[in-house]
């Protein structure tokens, strides 16, 4: 009888504690699925009200951990303000941007944004994570055209 009671108590404890004991903690970094979902949300916002959406992007309203949308003009390649503490390239031509390995990711971003609206292209390159450490790491960005803008969201691999 005592043995049955102990087994039942232990089983109940395991079932009660399992959801919290085995629950996954959210990652401090976003992933490809989350990046693409954020891009689609930002695109919908730009289509609804471009000026308001660009203000929201600059303020960081879309930002989630290390994920953030960014946009650039297709007419001149100028990068619009976006919420990244490492960003020093506002107003620069995206086509001039290169990673530490001299890969011209900006040219690839610009070319991806020339494709038909709604087509999403992924571009891989090296880029520092937001924060104090400026060491470049592998990153992939999803890029698409939204009217006269190229917009994207990247995640660290």
Role assignments for model-derived ranges:
Residues 2-157:
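N-terminal membrane-sensor/transducer module of prokaryotic signaling receptors
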């Amino acid at each position: 009888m005592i043995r049955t009671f102990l087994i039942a108590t232990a089983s109940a404890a395991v079932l009660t504690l399992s959801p919290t004991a085995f629950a996954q903690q959210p990652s401090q970094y976003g992933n490809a699925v989350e990046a693409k979902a954020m891009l689609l949300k930002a695109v919908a916002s730009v289509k609804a009200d471009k000026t308001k959406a660009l203000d929201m992007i600059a303020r960081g309203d879309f930002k989630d951990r290390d994920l953030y949308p960014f946009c650039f003009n297709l007419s001149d390649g100028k990068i619009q303000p976006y919420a990244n503490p490492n960003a020093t390239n506002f107003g620069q031509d995206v086509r001039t941007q290169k990673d530490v390995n001299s890969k011209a990711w900006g040219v690839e971003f610009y070319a991806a944004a020339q494709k038909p609206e709604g087509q999403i292209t992924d571009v891989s390159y090296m880029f520092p994570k937001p924060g104090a450490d400026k060491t470049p790491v592998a990153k992939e960005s999803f890029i698409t055209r939204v009217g006269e803008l190229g917009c994207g969201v990247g995640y660290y691999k």
